[in-house]
């Protein structure tokens, strides 16, 4: 039998060694783990494989007894009794949890190698482990892929301490990019995974290694799937609208440089309630009371709901517009709101900038060209984008310092098979196009049931627990609001309709609750129109026409210079790719030269501009598969010259696409008289 299994002192020494190595990388987390070790029972087992609770606590000179993870000694002992450690057939240590094998009962190391040496893992930039196991998978990853990001997610510190007692984690802790998420909530985990790149991560999630926290890992897997869906949607949106955004920005550039930003409102109204007006069917419930609500809360209206609000004679304090499409601009066609402030972004359809209102202000551009131009004028604050204009409206309320936000019309579903509020552009359009053989109700039913993303998900329910009809797109929006509610717990958000899709983190309120608030009309007007409140943030006073023109000239001159420099640099790289190579030295020289040029491209101030009309990774891979021969195996399995030739060929393809992107920018800038 493996002598470590019944040698308490050796296990104690191994735990101490692992904790010391852990402290070198994660000192704060190690202190928390060491406190857990004070309560940690024995990891030693007897020959039957049962836990033997006679292990002393590891040395701890701190004298602290707090438990940062919120567990207690009884919890640990109960969890330990479900984890059995025993000897594998090859003499290594293995384990089971609730009779599920964490590792092979024959050869744990070989099993880990087979799991990790797959194309899926080899091509990933990061390897993510759900659960610590005993450490065989992590050790194999450290040995075989030391240059990858290694991320270990373990919600229960007990299981990591148990692994530290019976397996040497030194190799894992020596990996340059190694991350341990121990006891972290799912939102924190998602944030870290997004930082390292979820799309390029290989997730290793054996059922046995996640059984001790099944609900946690199930929730995390759902969040990862939603996040990947969001990335897919973003890629497709960029592919579809990238050129439109670029065209709109070039048309709006001169006008936008003379506009102020939302900066003045930052944290200016923590004492005021906000009400977000979206265009869902439940907006009809609040419209009769909207005039009174305006006296008690700051109204932030989406462009889709504006027509309905004006129909009842109420001009909201703020109007949000984010979508760049022409059809979206039609929501505001023939409307005017001289008492309202319009908040938008430089890439919207140009007609938006001709809307008649009190003032148009901007938030920071979502796109590289807009952010580049902003460097030469007033710095503008950003707003989050969750795929829906309502998400930007919510984030604007949070940006203003709101502690309570009410939402009306944020249904994210089809209550009573309705699609939009009465009086909205969508609803009016169905009346306009309906006829005797296809009435309004048939159009609404078609909008619901022929939606490609339609799903009758029984888990989707309103605030009273009744099932609702929704689709995958709106569920993704709901997840965005859920994640923001978790990220900003001090901001309370309420739905004014029980018929809306229930968003975890939101609570249900009645319009009477809002109407029972005191009238604060003067305070609201002072904040919105900056007469008194928020005066400390009024640094964005309008620039003179002369200053605006100077800023515009400086921005365009710098943009032209930087684009031309990048264009010449990329052309030089493409020429280097065309050199003929015969020997390994020739290939090495070309690759070194390309590395030097890549450094210059990376340092360019306009390198990000190419991303707007650059193919997303999935499409780029598809282009490469169609344009290039199959990738040869890398050395030492393959020939160096063959692999180098393929890399040079692929680099040339990428440089060609970058040049096309630069040419597209120059084309639209010239078309609008912004490029000499």
What positions do the PLM features span?
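Class I S-adenosylmethionine
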Residues: 2-53, 73-126, 134-140, 245-262
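Intrinsically disordered, low-complexity terminal tails and inter-domain linkers enriched
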Residues: 41-82, 527-554
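Conserved acidic E/D residue at the C-terminus of a beta-strand in Rossmann-like folds
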Residues: 151-157, 303, 320-323
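Acidic/Gly/His-enriched mid-domain segments of enzyme catalytic cores or analogous surface patches
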Residues: 160, 164-242, 310-402, 626, ...
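Long, compositionally biased charged/polar accessory segments in the mid-to-C-terminal portions
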Residues: 475, 480, 485-676
């Amino acid at each position: 039998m493996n002598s470590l299994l019944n040698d308490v002192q050796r296990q104690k020494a191994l735990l101490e060694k692992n904790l010391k190595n852990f402290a070198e990388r994660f000192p704060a987390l190690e202190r928390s783990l060491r406190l857990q070790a004070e309560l940690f029972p024995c990891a030693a087992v007897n020959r039957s494989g049962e836990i033997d609770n006679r292990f002393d606590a590891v040395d701890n000179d701190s004298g602290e007894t707090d438990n940062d993870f919120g567990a207690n000694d009884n919890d640990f002992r109960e969890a330990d009794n479900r984890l059995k450690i025993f000897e594998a057939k090859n003499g290594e240590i293995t384990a089971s949890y609730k009779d599920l094998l964490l590792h092979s009962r024959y050869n744990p190391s070989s099993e880990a190698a087979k799991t990790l040496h797959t194309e899926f893992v080899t091509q990933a930039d990061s390897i993510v482990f759900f659960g610590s196991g005993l450490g065989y998978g992590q050790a194999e990853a450290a040995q075989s892929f030391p240059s990858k990001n290694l991320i270990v997610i373990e919600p229960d510190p007990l299981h990591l301490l148990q692994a530290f007692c019976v397996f040497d984690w030194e190799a894992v802790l020596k990996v340059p990019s190694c991350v341990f998420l121990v006891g972290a909530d799912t939102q924190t985990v998602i944030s870290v995974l997004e930082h390292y790149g979820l799309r390029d991560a290989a997730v290793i999630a054996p059922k046995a290694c996640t059984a001790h926290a099944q609900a946690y890992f199930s929730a995390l897997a759902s969040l990862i799937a939603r996040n990947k869906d969001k990335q897919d949607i973003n890629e497709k949106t960029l592919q579809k609208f990238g050129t439109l955004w670029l065209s709109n920005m070039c048309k709006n550039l001169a006008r936008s440089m003379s506009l102020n930003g939302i900066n003045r409102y930052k944290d200016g109204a923590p004492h005021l309630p906000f009400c977000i007006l979206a265009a869902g069917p439940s907006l009809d419930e609040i419209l009769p009371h909207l005039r009174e609500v305006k006296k008690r809360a700051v109204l932030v209206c989406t462009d889709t709901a504006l027509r309905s609000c004006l129909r009842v004679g109420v001009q909201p304090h703020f109007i949000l517009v984010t979508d760049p499409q022409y059809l979206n601009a039609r929501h505001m066609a023939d409307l005017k709101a001289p008492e309202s402030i319009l908040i938008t972004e430089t890439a919207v359809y140009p007609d938006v900038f001709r809307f008649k209102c009190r003032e148009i202000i901007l938030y920071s551009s979502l796109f590289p060209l807009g952010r580049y131009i902003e460097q030469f004028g007033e710095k503008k604050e950003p707003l989050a984008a969750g795929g829906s204009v309502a998400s930007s409206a919510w984030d604007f309320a949070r940006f203003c310092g709101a502690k309570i936000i009410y939402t009306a019309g944020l249904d994210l579903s089809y209550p009573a098979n309705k699609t939009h509020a009465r009086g909205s552009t969508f609803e009016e359009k169905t009346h306009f196009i309906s006829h005797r053989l296809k009435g309004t109700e048939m159009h609404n039913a078609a909008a619901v049931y022929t939606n490609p993303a339609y799903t009758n998900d029984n888990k989707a329910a309103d605030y009273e627990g009744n099932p609702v009809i929704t689709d995958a797109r709106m569920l993704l929006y709901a997840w965005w609001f859920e994640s923001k509610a978790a990220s900003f717990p001090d901001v309370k958000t309420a739905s004014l309709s029980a018929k809306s899709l229930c968003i975890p983190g939101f609570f249900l309120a009645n319009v009477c609750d809002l109407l029972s608030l005191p009238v604060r009309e003067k305070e609201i007007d002072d904040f919105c129109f900056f007469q008194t409140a928020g005066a400390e943030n009024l640094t964005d006073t309008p620039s003179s026409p002369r200053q605006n023109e100077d800023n515009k000239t400086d921005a365009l001159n710098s943009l032209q210079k930087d684009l031309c420099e990048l264009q010449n640099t990329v052309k030089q790289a493409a020429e280097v790719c065309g050199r003929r190579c015969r020997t390994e030295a020739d290939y090495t020289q070309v690759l070194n030269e390309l590395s030097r040029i890549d450094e210059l491209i990376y340092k360019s101030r306009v390198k990000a501009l190419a991303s707007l009309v650059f193919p997303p990774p999935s499409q780029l891979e598809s282009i490469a598969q169609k344009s290039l021969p199959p990738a040869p195996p890398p050395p030492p399995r393959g020939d160096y010259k063959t692999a180098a030739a393929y890399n040079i060929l692929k680099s040339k393809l990428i440089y060609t696409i970058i040049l096309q992107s630069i040419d597209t920018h120059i084309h639209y800038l010239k078309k609008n008289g912004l490029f000499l």
